[in-house]
Amino acid sequence: MAAAAAATFLPHTPTPRRRLAVAVHSPTRRRLSLVFSGPPDGALSVAAAEEKADAGEEAAAAVSAPRGGGGGGGKERRRVVRKAWEKLVRWSRSWRRRNRSDVVETTRKVVVLGGGSFGTAMAAQVAAKKADLEVSMLLRDDLVCRSINHSHINCKYLRDHRLPENITATTSASDALAGADFCFHAVPVQFSSSFLEGISTHVDPKLPFISLSKGLELNTLRTMSQIIPQALGNPRQPFIVLSGPSFAIELMNKLPTAMVVASKDKKLAAAVQQLLASPNLRISTSNDVTGVEIAGALKNVLAIAAGIVEGMHLGNNCMAALVAQGCSEIRWLATKMGAKPTTLSGLSGSGDIMLTCFVNLSRNRNVGLRLGSGEKLDEIMNSMNQVAEGVSTAGAVIALAQKYHVKMPVLTAVARIIDNELTPKKAVMELMNLPQVEEV
């Protein structure tokens, strides 16, 4: 279990995988084939090649060891597990040496658009990479600017955390964007188009935009990969999306986190991976921009549904059934739009869904919880100082589902509750009364 858990945080290699089959003969004379996956032969270090040679011998020892917790068999299994772990660590170190990049060394300035909790956390994450890296936050609030520049604290979000001194804030787009090597976009989706149009004259056409915003534009059904180039008037604007299970507060506390960057430009994704990766943040890469964006948008709506179930005290059985159904609905729509199924079971899919649906730090889950407890949506939204993207995304999701002819009963119910056309209690009754069908 330790090895499996640790594998989540080991470096990701974008190179093709090689499969090595080892035939092992057990004492019962039944032939067992074990398959090992690794980098292509050209990427193997000498140490890895040597380790490959005795893999069959150790596998045979593990298979032939007597069952049970005691005796020599237990010691042998522990020895095999220990050696496997040591090999994993050696491979990790070797991979890091081979894949060192000068991205961090050559990056002089990064700009962050937006001063919310996640934009602030990402600014701190990047600023910690090296002391002479200039990180400029473009904000609209003069008070927050002064707080960051004078006290190194965002007085509005994450107030208990001091920011690195190489982070500065400004309300001037020209000052913030001048000479930037990378741009992190952390403005809520519904405000992104107008915001970007306002700063477009200051944006270098080759400046890579890394989107942190999750959701769909309500009236147009556009994702950020469509909004950014269109708002900037540059269809070739380099674009990357960053997503995955991550709360800003835990990033600030340097707790272990894993995320994914997706871009159609493989080299650009690898560059952003190197820019962000740290001992507490593991970054994987993907070329499935559609899958990462759609999963990130739809999980917010599902989180509202999960919160409603919690607020109504409907129990764990109901919660599990609802989230499972919601995951299926997300898969149906995303794959129709061209997403890869593997993306939906990865960090930006299942990982982000689990975090957002089951953890109280989730804004969207808390909106649902309060709706399920009987509060009115207007009261809930007026009491929040941050945006819950799932509220505005819900209607767009259903319009998108109709466009692609996909039935989404759970997410449709959320949209109707938000529009005040259905009470949570009535929604549950109608969902439970749907026809008993074959699971797909």
Swiss-Prot record:
User: What does the record give as the active site?
Assistant: 299 (proton acceptor)
- Entry-linked InterPro entries: 6-PGluconate_DH-like_C_sf, 6PGD_dom2, G3P_DH_NAD-dep, G3P_DH_NAD-dep_C, G3P_DH_NAD-dep_N, NAD(P)-bd_dom_sf
* Source domain of life: Eukaryota
What's a single GO CC term here?
Answer: cytosol
The pathway entry for this protein reads as: Membrane lipid metabolism; glycerophospholipid metabolism
Q: What ranges does the record give for the region Disordered, renumbered to this chain?
A: 57-76
Query: What EC identifiers does the entry list?
Result: 1.1.1.8
- Any keyword Transit peptide? yes
The record's GO molecular-function terms, alphabetically, read: glycerol-3-phosphate dehydrogenase (NAD+) activity; NAD binding
Q: Which UniProt keywords apply?
A: Chloroplast, Lipid biosynthesis, Lipid metabolism, NAD, Oxidoreductase, Phospholipid biosynthesis, Phospholipid metabolism, Plastid, Transit peptide
Q: Which residues bind substrate?
A: 214, 363-364
Report disulfide bridges, numbered on this chain.
none
State the reactions this protein catalyses.
sn-glycerol 3-phosphate + NAD(+) = dihydroxyacetone phosphate + NADH + H(+)
Entry binding sites for NAD(+): 114-119, 191, 214, 248, 363, 389
Compartments, record wording: Plastid, Chloroplast
Q: Enumerate the Gene Ontology biological process terms.
A: carbohydrate metabolic process; glycerol-3-phosphate catabolic process; glycerol-3-phosphate metabolic process; glycerophospholipid metabolic process; phospholipid biosynthetic process
Q: Which HAMAP family match?
A: NAD_Glyc3P_dehydrog (MF_00394)
What functional role does this protein have? Required to supply glycerol-3-phosphate in the chloroplast for the synthesis of glycerolipids.
Which family does the similarity line name? Belongs to the NAD-dependent glycerol-3-phosphate dehydrogenase family.
The name this protein carries in UniProt is: Glycerol-3-phosphate dehydrogenase [NAD(+)], chloroplastic
Species: Oryza sativa subsp. japonica (Rice)
